Amino acid sequence: MYNKLQYISQGNTIEDQVRNIHQALDSGCDWIQMRFKNQTEKDSFILAEEIKLLCEKYLASFIINDNLYLAQQINADGVHLGLSDMKIDEARTILGAEKIIGGTANTFEDIQNHVKNGCNYIGLGPFRFTNTKEKLSPILGLSGYFEILQKMKKNKIEVPVYAIGGITLKDINPLMETGIHGIAVSGIITESDEKKILIQQLNEKLYANVIV
């Protein structure tokens, strides 16, 4: 099963991205999603190569946001696809059965389609408004997560669901009670001056009910 905490990278330059990702890894994060929008192919490739090496050093999983061909080119662990990106089944055909494919969802119907087409995990959101992403889908809130997770249970759909969108430390307990598997976060880690302490606190809450 996948780790419960995923860091979605931030930074407008290669240097910013590397620094932010390196700090997240060094502070205990073991799943990185590289998100480097509106960049040249060359810069995206340079960054991905560097981050792959870092993730290998820290024994962390490494997936790439939206760019399936880059993920294939550098042999990343997988890719995360948005609602307007390549279809999940097409991505599965290209990447093969072993790679991780995550899909963004805003509704129960989105999840149904993703799972049917071979998605490994769902990034469900947004939980609340966030400046990290443009063109947000409708805000879900706790009630939205509860309703969608209940529909999944009723329809016997079992796939790890990650909450995303403006999540803070105090949100984790009520979110986990809805039945999600974990969270995918950006700003809370990037902007923290005490990343090790924060990631430890996040993981303590995320894994609170896990029996080892």
Swiss-Prot record:
Recorded catalytic activity of this chain's protein: 2-[(2R,5Z)-2-carboxy-4-methylthiazol-5(2H)-ylidene]ethyl phosphate + 4-amino-2-methyl-5-(diphosphooxymethyl)pyrimidine + 2 H(+) = thiamine phosphate + CO2 + diphosphate; 2-(2-carboxy-4-methylthiazol-5-yl)ethyl phosphate + 4-amino-2-methyl-5-(diphosphooxymethyl)pyrimidine + 2 H(+) = thiamine phosphate + CO2 + diphosphate; 4-methyl-5-(2-phosphooxyethyl)-thiazole + 4-amino-2-methyl-5-(diphosphooxymethyl)pyrimidine + H(+) = thiamine phosphate + diphosphate
Origin organism lineage: Bacteria, Pseudomonadati, Bacteroidota, Flavobacteriia, Flavobacteriales
Function per UniProt: Condenses 4-methyl-5-(beta-hydroxyethyl)thiazole monophosphate (THZ-P) and 2-methyl-4-amino-5-hydroxymethyl pyrimidine pyrophosphate (HMP-PP) to form thiamine monophosphate (TMP).
Superkingdom, taxonomy of origin: Bacteria
Name this protein carries in UniProt: Thiamine-phosphate synthase
Needed co-factor(s): Mg(2+)
CDD domains: TMP_TenI (cd00564)
Enzyme's top EC category: transferase
